[in-house]
Amino acid sequence: MLSVSLPQIKHDFPELQLKEGEVFSWNPNSQTVYYEKLDSQEDLVQLLHEIAHAKLGHKNYQHDIQLIEMERSAWEYAVDTLAPKYGLTLSMDDDNIQDCLDSYRDWLHKRSLCPQCGAVGLQATASSYRCINCHSEWRVNQAKSCQLKRYQIK
């Protein structure tokens, strides 16, 4: 049983739309937080994390490292500000939170690997990287929850 109801959360954040969706996510354009299901405390914590993105004004990012910072700050806000409001005791060290952060760190690392030599490259633009080892360049897609693709361009 959840410690708080969805109607209570909707009441507490009238400026946001909360809608059932396929994945937990925040859409800044429509001011909508999407949630998969709310069957467990982990689901509730994930919902609070997405609400944290909204409360922190998170929108777009230009460099992948900015996404990592946004994710970390949203988790910190959920842990320090939102969870206590609903009687939840969370820590940044919780396995679920670290697993979520690890998934973004792993995603970032995979994007940065040179498809030519395997060295870690440097991000040049929002969707391209350069290898400092072999000087290859590659484009990446924006996939975070599906298959990451890298396309060598030089």
Go through the PLM ranges and name each one.
Residues 1-43, 54, 58:
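Active-site scaffold of zinc-dependent metalloenzymes
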Residues 8-12, 81, 96, 100:
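Residues that form generic nucleotide/phosphate-binding pockets
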Residues 35-38, 65, 121-122:
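Short N-terminal micro-motifs specific to bacterial/archaeal maturation
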Residues 49, 53:
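Histidine-centered divalent metal-coordination motifs
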Residues 57-65:
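Substrate-binding clefts and substrate-entry loops adjacent to catalytic sites
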Residues 66-95:
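Post-HExxH zinc-binding segment in Zn-dependent metallohydrolases
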Residues 85-94, 98-154:
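Pan-zinc metallopeptidase signature
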